[in-house]
Amino acid sequence: MIPLDEILYNAVKADSALMEAIGGRVVSTCFEVSPEEKKDNTPLPCIIINDDGKQAQPETKDSTWLLTDWKVQADIEVDAERPKDVDRLIEMCNRAVARYIKTLNYADTPQLDSIQTQGKAWDWMKPCYHDRLIYSCTVYKTYNDNEQEE
């Protein structure tokens, strides 16, 4: 299964109109980020893909003690000079991800639980407007009884 943050990164990179709109400036925490690519040094507009981690959620006391489903979350952060640019780029990202998911094998995609935005805000440190498009998914893993631990 492809990690959620890599799906989001690949979706953004695959959309030529979106890449043109942001001048090709995409940074992702799923790869090592050089000091030149860190958020505060990136010109506007830009996109930052963040991996927000995973957590296990067993259903009941009777659930198996071997976790087979994980809740994962990743987001696309859009930074821009104007609020309207943030809105436009968030919508472009949402469409890019939806198109990209259709190109993947069903087995490679996590189950989507929710998509939400954080809401536009002003970052006085950069300074810029920003918003986050947050994807929450469930990833299922199956184990064979004879499977060795990794």
Please give the residue ranges for each predicted region.
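Extracellular/virion structural assembly segments
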Residues: 65-66, 77-100
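Oligomerization/assembly interface segments of phage tail-like spikes and tubes
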Residues: 64-81, 128-141
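Residues embedded in well-ordered secondary-structure elements
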Residues: 38, 63-65, 124
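Acidic-leaning, charged glycine-interspersed low-complexity segments
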Residues: 95-150
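Generic non-transmembrane alpha-helical segments
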Residues: 7-18, 92, 96-104
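A generic structural signal for short, non-catalytic loop/turn and secondary-structure boundary residues
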Residues: 40-42, 67, 110, 128
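Small/polar-rich, solvent-exposed N-terminal microdomains that initiate assembly or binding
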Residues: 1-61, 84, 146-150
